Amino acid sequence: MNEHEFAQKTIAIRRKVREQRPLVHHITNFVVMNITANVTLAVGASPVMAHAHEEVKEMAAFAGALNLNIGTLTPYWIDAMVMAGKVAEQRGIPIVLDPVGSGATPLRTGAAKKILAEVGVNVIRGNASEVMSLFADKETVNIRGVDSLETVDAVRHEAGLLAGELEKVVAVTGPVDIVTDGTRTLEVHNGTPMFGRVTGTGCSATTVISCFCAVEPDLLVASAAALGYYGLAGEEAARISNGPGSFQAALLDTLYNLPEKIIQEKLRIREVLP
């Protein structure tokens, strides 16, 4: 697909989300529960935040997508993610993993790898260091070093290797977002530095991916379209805001109101040929 076709596909997916209003089951962290629930609503889906062992299986069973986020971990929550994930996998419900901080501590890295080993995760969304930690033998990596040294070409190469090895869609977010399944690779050139000034913007990107995956069977395209849509909303929000506080509010408004004309004109998704 060319950029125009990706824009049309993104518009079609957003329309479908708003028509179907899929339930997106989040087992996520305390820091971002409120903002990611609101992002889900702004995109057009329905959020539920449920992590109690007594209900996660039931909730996952009738969700349109399952969003697993390891930002504030306990062993109890890890078990809840595995329980919900197994039900979602059995029912063919897309599972999106955000390995927040993987590589920073053995707990986080171990939790991410445990979920990947025991649950049929479909999409992984993280920054370069988080994604590399899933590929490395070590339990910790130099997060600052990885983020500063990686080039777009290197990230694209390593993400492709990981996606091919795990047979999953891998989305690495950064100045240029890379989305790959090991065979096809897409680049997303939308976004804003303001994402780095407000907490939860990465987790919110994963939420939009989950919403789009709930209605679009091609999870590679759904993930790239979600990141393009989210990045473009961020660009427009940054343009009309005056700082982090107004940006956060403007981002919700823009996710809700982003005109299709702007998507057609400004979405920047392209396929990278091997």
Swiss-Prot record:
Taxonomy, superkingdom: Bacteria
UniProt key word Aminoacyl-tRNA synthetase: no
InterPro entries the record matches: Hyethyz_kinase, Ribokinase-like
Tagged with keyword Nucleotide-binding: yes
Transmembrane segments: none
EC number(s) per entry: 2.7.1.50
Pathway where it operates: Cofactor biosynthesis; thiamine diphosphate biosynthesis; 4-methyl-5-(2-phosphoethyl)-thiazole from 5-(2-hydroxyethyl)-4-methylthiazole: step 1/1
Name this protein carries in UniProt: Hydroxyethylthiazole kinase
Keywords per UniProt: ATP-binding, Kinase, Magnesium, Metal-binding, Nucleotide-binding, Thiamine biosynthesis, Transferase
Sequence similarity: Belongs to the Thz kinase family.
HAMAP family per the UniProt record, alphabetical: Thz_kinase
Record GO terms (molecular function): ATP binding; hydroxyethylthiazole kinase activity; magnesium ion binding
Organism this protein belongs to: Desulfosudis oleivorans (strain DSM 6200 / JCM 39069 / Hxd3) (Desulfococcus oleovorans)
